[in-house]
């Protein structure tokens, strides 16, 4: 049963990562407690070392590790077998997967000791708990009804935000959280919700169907929301077993092979560009041919069943490698970096404090006064970096908002060619028939919305790349400013103690000696549970992609569509009516439609460009403002802590007699305790690396 090994290995590796997370979380918590206890003891001895920032950061990191999960977002159009796939993955017939029903709400599947479903609403109502049968009955709809709702731009359950399904399953218990999206469509509310998860998941499982290879809707979604955004996507071609069933002679091996190869060529042609990382082709590690129904049937009969021939073993191996090796190692490396910083800060503070215990108050004040110029230099570095961020902010906000303005104003230049692919099938008699005119108008409105959505997505991708490039440049500047900052803090230590103190002994060749604020600014530290997917600096504690999302869902996709489509329908209708009942040339009718649409569109583009470019400006500005606020706060905290560390010692010397020997021992014990916790974290990380090597 060799292929069962993939499932077992996945569970075992998840368990191993969960154990390491737990070990590191405990060590971080003890590290925070150790430093905090020492700070409290400092009040009755030589004074606090002002390590509040380290205590706060490692406490947050410890909590994040405790709550750590790998979040998988399942995307796919209706009737692609998403629920069947998920049931096969978890090994239970949990989610509705009958022939007809479609899950109609976004569902978050996570571990819970008891089986329960909680519905969360968006209108202020309190969450509602349901049993599974009622959930399946109430929140699944027929595909025909789903299609009708989509055409009418309506949601099946407009008051529902999402559902949380808790279930005592091994896969979930070991740290997997699954988000099941209702389907691919262009409703703004749905996309806003789904895109929020797209930006905050570890991997996307994009479910397709062998019998419907790469539909227009799927290609549009990938082009608009996935392409070029640094996301990790696993493409799951479901119902591969039905390729054989579609043949006239299912036993014809040659015909089956030819049919499968044709399908593979189609999928490769459409998906290859999404399976390249830094120039390397990883198509075989990202695209999988699955037979979910076969896997589910086997696992329901025997959870340990051999899944050979279903495609699941290969998929599980790739997902396992990505999550428990690539992503887990990256996450835990940041934790190790944070622990090293806390250890170094403690050792630096102890190394400064011990020599100063020997000095009387006057000598101590004299030495503190002597380093005032250096502290002014630290403030100068802060001001210079802050100025660079603000200049970058202003340049990017102006440039990107202007690019949006130009982009919108130029839509009319290419509209006639661009709109052809969106134009609905034009039956003039349908339009002239009052009974069918509403359906025609709805189809036309949907065509405009798709056109505007695609155009907006294309521009947004360009804007994101520009912003990302700007943050990369700021990251390089942070490294340079950090190096200068370190030189000055070393000078402060030398002038205070009279010694050249080397304290960066826990830093290896793979890391630089940048101060904590610079590491944060460079994206080397993450204290945020969001922004898990893609882009350099995605690990940074601020979340610029979600800032953009929050603004851009308010913007012109909604604003442009509202401004344009509602106004266009009237003039277009008059133009078509003017052709007369006897006019049967559909081609000319189409040309008239596009011509009139362009004429009306161009009328409104200046207003849209003017109004929405300000929204774009504000969005980009807020991205850099949030970054600047956090960077400035962290630099200020560092400068203030260094000053207060010295002021605390002066205050204590002025008010009490300090027992130098006991204080020396206390500080040395603190240093040893901190190093001991760091060593445990280093060992846990190294052991995990050794296991995977």
Swiss-Prot record:
Compartments, as annotated in UniProt: Cell inner membrane
Region (Middle domain): 311-571
Function statement: Dynamin-related GTPase probably involved in membrane remodeling. Lipid and nucleotide-binding are thought to induce a large intramolecular rearrangement, leading to assembly on lipid bilayers and possible membrane curving. In the presence of the non-hydrolyzable GTP analog GMP-PNP self-assembles on a lipid bilayer; this does not stimulate subsequent GTPase activity. Does not bind lipids in the presence of GDP; perhaps GTP hydrolysis disrupts membrane-binding.
Name this polypeptide is given: Bacterial dynamin-like protein
Intramembrane segments: 522-574
Residue ranges of the region described as G5 motif: 268
Residue numbers spanned by region Paddle domain: 572-606
Residues of the Dynamin-type G domain: 66-313
GO molecular function: GTP binding; GTPase activity; identical protein binding; lipid binding
Gene Ontology cellular-component terms listed: plasma membrane
Sequence ranges on the Cytoplasmic membrane side: 1-521, 575-693
Domain notes for this protein: The GTPase domain dimerizes and forms the BDLP tube surface, the middle and GED domains are elongated and involved in self-assembly, while the paddle region inserts into the outer leaflet of the membrane, possibly promoting membrane curvature.
Region (G3 motif) residue spans: 180-183
Residue ranges of the region described as G1 motif: 76-83
